[in-house]
From Swiss-Prot:
SMART domains: AAA, ClpB_D2-small, zf-C4_ClpX. The keyword Nucleotide-binding applies. One of its GO terms (biological process) is proteolysis involved in protein catabolic process. It comes from Xanthobacter autotrophicus (strain ATCC BAA-1158 / Py2). ATP binds at residues 119-126. This is ATP-dependent Clp protease ATP-binding subunit ClpX. Belongs to the ClpX chaperone family. Component of the ClpX-ClpP complex. Forms a hexameric ring that, in the presence of ATP, binds to fourteen ClpP subunits assembled into a disk-like structure with a central cavity, resembling the structure of eukaryotic proteasomes.
Length: 422
C-alpha cells in the first residue's frame, strides 16, 4: 500500500497529506479512511489565518473598520480597551484619508499622529506592532534615547525613515504609507521648564528634529545608512502620509497631573485639604492635558504634532494571568510549544499563573517582565529535559514559583520530581 496515507502491512499509520508515519509526528488524527497529522493541521490553520488577514485588509478599499481593527487587537493584546478604541478609530481615519485624498480636493484632512502614555509593560509597543500587522504596511521601531540632532554623535532622526524604507524592501511608495513607532519618547523631554541656553542635543533638539518628519517633509535618505556624505546618492521619501506613533512611560507625569487637578484647594484656613494621592499612575494618566505634557518637558510644537492621545492603565493580576495564557502568541503557549519539540507536555497550574503575575507586579515590570520570570522558573527544567528519557509531562505548581520547589516530572511508567533520576 502507498505510504501517502492509511497504513502498511506492519499496521503503521501515515498522514494522508504529507505522508509522514505516526512515529515521525506527535499526533495523528483519524477520519473516514484518511489520517491527518498535527503538523498538517497547523499548516492549514496558518493558511486560513493568512487568508482571513488578507480578506480583512482588502475589505472596503483596503481599510478595515474600527471594529475589525479592535477585534484583531483583542486577539493579541489583553485589556486596555480605551486605548484600543482610540487607536482603531485613529488608524482607520488615517488610511481612509490616504485612500480618498485624490478624490476630494476641496478639504484637506490633517494627519493625526498618536501619543501613547502608559506604565512600563502595559502594551504600548505590542499595540503598534499589531496595528502594522493588521494593515499589512511597513513598520519600524526607533528608540528616542539613541536619537540626536544631525551633526552630533548618535543616530540621526532621518535614520528612522531609512529603517522604514528597509522594512519596505526599498519600495519608496510602500514606505510612504508605513507606520513608525518611537519608543521612550518621554526621555527626550526638555531638561527644565525654561528654554535652555546651552545645546540640548538629545532632548529639545531631538524634538525639534522630529517635528519636520512628523508633520511632513521630503527626507533625503542615504541608502547605505549611516552619516551622509556628498558622494552618496539619496532616496527621496515624503513623510506626509507616514503615521507616527510615539510611546513612553512618562515617570512622574502623574504627580504633575495630580498637582494641577488639586489646584489651590489647600490654601487658607477654610480650604479643604485634598487626601493624599493613592491612585495608580495609570489611573491618573487618564486626566492628562496638553499643559501637563508641556510642564513635563515636551515643547508646544511637538505636542501639537501628536493630536491623538491614548492612555494605558496598569495591568492587574487578572490581566497578567490572561496575558500569560489567552492571546494567540501567549507566553505559556510558546513554552508549551518548546516542550512539545521534546515530546513533553507542559502543564502550569492556575495558582502558578497567579504567582507569576504577582511577581511581575512586585517588580513593577508589567507584562514585559513575565518572560524573564518564566525563564527563571523553567531554566533548570529546560537544561535537564533534553538529556532525560521517558518524561511525558512537566507540571509547574504555585510552590515552584513562590518557593523555588522542583517541578513535577511525570514519566511514562512513574511519577517523580525534578530531582529524580531518569
Amino acid at each position: 500500500m502507498s505510504k501517502t496515507g492509511g497504513s502498511d502491512s506492519k499496521n503503521t499509520l501515515y498522514c494522508s497529506f504529507c505522508g509522514k508515519s505516526q512515529h515521525e509526528v506527535r499526533k495523528l488524527i483519524a477520519g473516514p479512511t484518511v489520517f491527518i497529522c498535527d503538523e498538517c493541521v497547523e499548516l492549514c490553520m496558518d493558511i486560513i489565518r493568512e487568508e482571513s488577514k488578507s480578506s480583512l485588509v482588502k475589505s472596503r478599499d483596503g481599510i478595515p473598520t474600527p471594529k475589525e481593527i479592535r477585534k484583531v487587537l483583542d486577539d493579541y493584546v489583553i485589556g486596555q480597551d480605551h486605548a484600543k478604541k482610540v487607536l482603531s478609530v485613529a488608524v482607520h481615519n488615517h488610511y481612509k484619508r490616504l485612500n480618498h485624498a485624490t478624490k476630494h480636493g476641496d478639504v484637506e484632512l490633517a494627519k493625526s499622529n498618536i501619543l501613547l502614555i502608559g506604565p512600563t509593560g502595559s502594551g504600548k509597543t505590542l499595540l503598534a506592532q499589531t496595528l502594522a500587522r493588521i494593515l499589512d504596511v511597513p513598520f519600524t521601531m526607533a528608540d528616542a534615547t539613541t536619537l540626536t540632532e544631525a551633526g552630533y554623535v548618535g543616530e540621526d532622526v532621518e535614520n528612522i525613515i531609512l529603517k522604514l524604507l528597509q522594512a519596505a524592501d526599498y519600495n519608496v511608495e510602500r514606505a510612504q504609507r508605513g507606520i513608525v513607532y518611537i519608543d521612550e519618547i518621554d526621555k527626550i523631554s526638555r531638561k527644565s521648564d525654561n528654554p535652555s541656553i546651552t545645546r540640548d542635543v538629545s532632548g529639545e533638539g531631538v524634538q525639534q528634529a522630529l517635528l519636520k518628519i512628523m508633520e511632513g517633509t521630503v527626507a533625503s535618505v542615504p541608502p547605505q545608512g549611516g552619516r551622509k556624505h556628498p558622494q552618496q546618492e539619496f532616496l527621496q521619501v515624503d513623510t506626509t502620509n507616514i503615521l507616527f506613533i510615539c510611546g513612553g512611560a512618562f515617570a512622574g507625569l502623574d504627580k504633575i497631573i495630580s498637582s494641577r487637578s488639586k489646584g489651590s484647594t489647600s490654601i487658607g484656613f477654610q480650604a479643604k485639604v485634598a487626601p493624599p494621592e493613592d491612585r495608580r499612575p495609570g489611573e491618573v494618566f487618564r486626566e492628562v492635558e496638553p499643559e501637563d505634557l508641556l510642564k513635563y518637558g515636551l515643547i508646544p510644537e511637538f505636542i501639537g504634532r501628536l493630536p491623538v492621545l491614548a492612555t494605558l492603565g496598569d495591568l492587574d493580576e487578572e490581566a497578567l494571568k490572561k496575558i500569560l495564557s489567552e492571546p494567540k502568541n501567549a507566553l505559556v503557549k510558546q513554552y508549551q510549544r518548546l516542550f512539545e519539540m521534546e515530546n513533553v507536555d507542559l502543564t502550569i497550574h492556575e495558582e502558578a499563573l497567579g504567582a507569576i503575575a504577582r511577581k511581575a507586579i512586585e517588580r513593577k515590570t508589567g507584562a514585559r517582565g513575565l518572560r524573564s520570570i518564566m525563564e527563571s522558573i523553567l531554566l533548570d527544567t529546560m537544561f535537564d529535559l533534553p538529556g532525560l528519557e521517558g518524561v511525558e509531562e512537566v507540571v509547574i505548581s504555585r510552590e515552584v514559583v513562590e518557593q523555588s520547589a522542583r517541578p513535577l516530572y511525570i514519566y511514562a511508567d512513574r511519577v517523580g520530581d525534578a530531582g529524580a533520576s531518569a
